[in-house]
UniProtKB/Swiss-Prot annotation:
UniProt cross-references to CDD domains, sorted A to Z: PoNe_Nuclease
InterPro entries for this protein: Restrct_endonuc-II-like (IPR011335), tRNA_endonuc-like_dom_sf (IPR011856), UPF0102_YraN-like (IPR003509)
Gene Ontology molecular function, alphabetical: nucleic acid binding
Lineage: Bacteria, Bacillati, Bacillota, Clostridia, Eubacteriales
Family named by the database record: Belongs to the UPF0102 family.
Protein name per UniProt: UPF0102 protein Dred_2035
Length: 122
């Protein structure tokens, strides 16, 4: 992954965190890593549901909309990552959870142009 893509991804995650915090979410963990991969954001929504959030960022529309890049393979990986996370947290054994996708669009100047939040994306 190029340095520019990594920086764009990090900036997108920062903007997504600000966005969900403004909606009343409480961020529990960022960039949870295990041998399978990484979950971008794990948070509690305002009604107390555990939410696994995948953040996708784009600086243009040439490669499609960010949220469409979460394909079947990525969805399966996210499910496995969430299962792994929940296995390590026995206190969450009976907690309801969902998967959301946040697409962050940046304009040419690097400012946020639009944020799309898709709840129950998987």
């Amino acid at each position: 992954m190029s340095i520019q893509r990594k920086a764009l991804g990090n900036k997108g995650e920062e903007e997504a965190c600000k966005y969900i915090q403004n909606l009343g979410y409480n961020i529990m963990e960022r960039n949870y890593r295990c041998k399978i991969g990484e979950l971008d954001i794990i948070a509690w929504d305002p009604v107390g549901m555990l939410v696994f959030l995948e953040v996708r960022s784009r600086s243009g529309r040439a490669f499609g909309v960010p949220e469409e890049s979460v394909n079947y393979r990525k969805q399966n990986k996210l499910r496995m990552l969430a299962q792994q996370f929940l296995l390590t947290k026995s206190e969450f054994a009976k907690i309801s959870c969902r998967f959301d996708v946040i697409g962050v669009y940046f304009n040419k100047e690097g400012s946020v142009q639009e944020i799309k939040h898709i709840k129950n994306a998987l």
